[in-house]
Amino acid sequence: MIRNNKSMFIKLKDQSSYEMPSGSTAKDLADKLNLKGPHEALGASINGKTVDLSYPLQEGDQVILWGFNDPEGKEIFWHTSAHVLAQAILRLWPDAQPTIGPPIENGFYYDFANLTISDADFEKIEKEMQAIISENFQIKREVISTKSDALKQFQNNPYKCELINSFEDESTLTGYRQGEFYDLCRGPHLFNLGKIKALKLMKTAGAYWRGDSNKEMLTRIYAISFPDRKLLKDYLHQLEEAKKRDHKLLGAKLDLFSLKEEAPGMPFIHPKGLIVWNQLVAYIRECLSRHDYIEIKTPTMMTKELWEISGHWGNYRQNMFISQIEDRDFAIKPMNCPGCMLYYKSHTHSYRELPLRIAEIGNVHRYEPSGSLSGLFRVRSFHQDDAHIFMKPSDIQQEILGVLALADEIYSTFGLSYRLELSTRPEKNTIGTDHEWEVATAGLKGALDEMGKEYRINEGDGAFYGPKIDFHIRDAINRSWQCGTIQLDMALPEKFELEYTFSDGTRQRPVMIHRAIFGSIERFFGILIEHYVGKFPLWLSPSQIRFITVADRHEPYARELAKRFKNAGFHVDVDSTQESVSKKVRNAQLAQFNYILTIGDQEVEHKTANLRTRDNVVHGEIQIDEFIQKLEIEKQQRQSHSPYASAERN
């Protein structure tokens, strides 16, 4: 490759080399590549570090440009939008004191002291934000020389000063300036404000400074912004759809679960909900059996000494429920892992036994502040479909492939697509040697490459004990949920001194994978309620078939049929009330019965039933034996869609 001495070569995401003039910035590269739409560059990663587009490039740099379709791009976009919000608030309420304003999963927020507003102020604030954006300020990053300089610059804001004092003395402090607004911030940010085309304030809330209930209550403003007005319109539509799918409302309406003040954050699963629950557990157990897992059950409460070995007592105690029995400290398990380590140690192991796949559907308890509890999504008591796989280092890639295949099979059954993220070694405070991390990361990456699914790399975002793969599933309205995880753990086998005998007779430390696919079964149940809008496929449904009688004389035949369907393994109900047929049909549809069978004089005479679906697809008279056979196939194959979804299939 020929080059002149005033140019340099950098590497793009696809590892191809690209020639740029010496002294170029990431923005120069973005301008040259001229990416458009959701791929238009908002920021960059250079050698794994996320930076502003103004960042200078050097010979050999590995450069990835982030657009709004990337999580990194959204984070940069929303972080800058938070600064626009703070600037607007200060223009309108000069005595307000900005504290922190981070991007979050959907948009951003900013917390303010000395500010009282209501929803009635939103229009005024949005108008001021639009005015600031129209000024199209270039955003400038400024390095602050010392902590004392930073304290001087923010001397009138005690919240910023508290943050500054919490940093280590050698930390590099930076500020960002747009017009008259200047904020203490590590960045990165947009190059200018012109990229922000649409925004909306969502709500206000109270928030304690730094999340500490002993500190001041601040005013938090939530908002969201987009580089395109249509994206905002689509997002607001998605919010309306999400309201219809709220699992808390549907859970009550369909009598699936409830939450009681007497047990905050600990769900009561009702009979109908337990039918769904049991099907989920039976399904995953079936999958585990086919993939050669064994299953164990470990105690719910174990001694302090165990949690000291695992590190939970020192690092996680504030999130544990602790009790004292006979002068000994016990903790209810917040995780299943330490119990599995004890099970592994209860036997001696040979390399011939490995890989050893051990599953547990364990009930764990974690303290969560009452204000953070939310339906089935954020609870204090939940079940995890955990598994720990013990193996030789040479097994890593093949075992990861096996877990990836298992997860793909399970998510596909529910009609859930997903994306994958590989998180690599953090810069500081990790255990294990460089070689161990290289082998572990190469194993995970090799498995992902072999699987052939697209994935993204989160540089430095792994756990201190090993790299990990996360599954982000997408539901029916395209919301993303982090569910499954595959974590390679180099810490617990060391802490518990786990061993196996190698072929040469030496005792060696196994490599361990921690994996979960549902994650929290309660949370996954909640996701499915919203994904299906309560309309569970037949195999999961707690309300499969309802018989409706036209008159009292039809009840004996309806109950005879109901018994046949129950004997065939279906959940059946008979409505023989005095309501009109149309009202009974409507009630059955609202209760989300998959199939509604009406019995009248003709059906009694012909020994048939009149079929319609919960979506009001009417099929008329059907033969009972044939219908049962079709439903058995639908249930056994765990079909997502009913063969009776359209009238043409009759």
Swiss-Prot record:
Pfam families for this protein: HGTP_anticodon, TGS, tRNA-synt_2b, tRNA_SAD
Q: Kindly provide the name given to this protein in its UniProt entry.
A: Threonine--tRNA ligase
- Describe the function of this protein: Catalyzes the attachment of threonine to tRNA(Thr) in a two-step reaction: L-threonine is first activated by ATP to form Thr-AMP and then transferred to the acceptor end of tRNA(Thr). Also edits incorrectly charged L-seryl-tRNA(Thr).
Q: Where does Zn(2+) bind?
A: 337, 388, 514
**Gene Ontology cellular component?**
cytoplasm
In this chain the TGS domain maps to: 5-67
Q: Could you state a single Gene Ontology molecular function term?
A: ATP binding
Q: Which InterPro entries match?
A: aa-tRNA-synt_IIb (IPR002314), aa-tRNA-synth_II (IPR006195), aa-tRNA-synth_II/BPL/LPL (IPR045864), Anticodon-bd (IPR004154), Anticodon-bd_dom_sf (IPR036621), Beta-grasp_dom_sf (IPR012675), TGS (IPR004095), TGS-like (IPR012676)
Q: How is the cofactor bound?
A: Binds 1 zinc ion per subunit.
Which SUPFAM superfamilies does the entry link to? Class II aaRS ABD-related, Class II aaRS and biotin synthetases, TGS-like, ThrRS/AlaRS common domain
- Which EC numbers characterise this protein's activity in its record? 6.1.1.3
The Swiss-Prot or TrEMBL record describes its family as follows: Belongs to the class-II aminoacyl-tRNA synthetase family.
User: Assembly and partners?
Assistant: Homodimer.
Which CDD domains has this protein been placed in?
A: TGS_ThrRS, ThrRS_anticodon, ThrRS_core
Q: What subcellular compartments does it reside in?
A: Cytoplasm
Q: Which UniProt keywords apply?
A: Aminoacyl-tRNA synthetase, ATP-binding, Cytoplasm, Ligase, Metal-binding, Nucleotide-binding, Protein biosynthesis, RNA-binding, tRNA-binding, Zinc
Annotated stretches, region: Catalytic: 246-537
Q: What is the predominant subcellular site recorded for this chain?
A: cytoplasm
Q: Name one GO biological process term.
A: threonyl-tRNA aminoacylation
